[in-house]
Amino acid sequence: MKLSKYISIAILFFSVSAAFAQQLPQFTQYMFNTISINPAYAGSRETLSVVGLHRSQWVGLEGGPETQTLSIHTPLRNEKMGLGISFINDKLGYENFSYLYADYSYTINTSANTKLAFGMKGGLTHYSLDEELLNDPSVTEDPFFNDISNRWSPNVGAGLFLHSSRWYLGLSAPRILNTDYNKGSDGLRNFVAFERISYYFTGGYVFNLSETTKLKPSALLKATNGAPLSFDISANFLFNEKLWLGGAYRINEHAAAIGGIADFQISKQMRIGYAYEYPISDIAAYTSGTHEVLLMFEVFKSKRIKSPRYF
């Protein structure tokens, strides 16, 4: 594949989502995948929880983002501390990011029904370039590409998670340290990512509409230095404690989107979710939309643990 093809892809991405790769990947089902952005969530489900997610963004556009996540977290025996480990693989055009991080949380009771968790995370980010690009004759001899590819960078994060059985509020910064992957090369700086600190503000509430129906609105605000603000809002209905159905809307200067969510509790231990998202920005002319699949598995549930959990 010619270098010009990769550069064309990069120009398109940056024209519709300025500095998109500077940020952690975004999710439509963020309300069911909180551990990926907030370490204070570790152990909050009061059981060993395993969550896997696959996201194919902007399907039909060559080089569109693809993301996979896998996280495992659990409370310890004293139930005040939680531990977790999370892995994220994110591919955007010719760039690949892999995140491997450990999570720790400590929870205190602020009232009879409310808990506040403090969280920290630490780990490594791996940055690499697509092998097809590196093997292209037009770039093989360019030391710039060889220097920036296959880099490991340490990072740390922190978060707060305040919650009861009916509502939650979260504040987190999963990557605090800034990382520049350009190594001082000015010529192609616009086509190589920076990893910059992002702040996440989350919240949600569960309303009882009837004996069999509940409504859970939720929101996520993401602020990244050098990138547009992103605001996600969603509303999900829960029917018979089994089926979630809802919609989502993302407000973003370059990557606005609307979507639908369906999530089914197969058993007390397993649930599966699907989300479809369609952009309402300039990128819509090049894609049929975004698909996202989530699978959650929980083990060692005791009878005292409420199922299903609302967040």
Regions found by a protein language model. Name each.
Residues 22-311:
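Subset of outer-membrane beta-barrel
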Residues 1, 21-22:
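Absolute protein N-terminus
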Residues 1-8:
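Bacterial N-terminal signal peptides that target proteins for export
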Residues 8-9, 19:
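Cleavable N-terminal signal peptides
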